[in-house]
């Protein structure tokens, strides 16, 4: 697929506390979105949304990895450079 747009979401340096707030908020919102998708599937179809459940598991794994990095940065009194981009493509 051809990338329609690439948007710079985050590109800055943060303390571990700031990085924690930004990243955990992003991940928690995404996890909650997928929980709602799964709940909707349960109500409408009487079954789990496997795609949403898999995504939740992936996101929770990422949260654990990020938490380790943030703790290490805090312990070493280091700032974190974070870059994040969103790529938007058309799907058939």
Tell me the role of every PLM-derived stretch.
Residues 25, 62, 69, 73:
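Residues that form generic nucleotide/phosphate-binding pockets
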Residues 42, 49, 67-70, 74, ...:
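Coiled-coil heptad-register positions
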Residues 28, 33-65:
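Amphipathic, hydrophobic secondary-structure cores in small proteins
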Residues 76-92:
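C-terminal edge-of-domain segments
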Residues 3-37:
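N-terminal acidic leader/helix
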């Amino acid at each position: 697929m051809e990338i329609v747009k690439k948007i710079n979401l985050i590109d800055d340096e943060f303390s571990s506390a700031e990085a924690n707030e930004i990243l955990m908020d992003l991940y928690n919102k995404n996890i909650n979105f997928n929980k709602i998708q799964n709940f909707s599937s349960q109500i409408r179809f009487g079954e789990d949304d496997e795609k949403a459940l898999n995504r939740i598991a992936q996101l929770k794994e990422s949260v654990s990895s990020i938490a380790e990095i943030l703790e290490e940065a805090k312990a070493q009194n280091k700032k974190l450079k974070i870059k994040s981009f969103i790529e938007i493509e058309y799907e058939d």
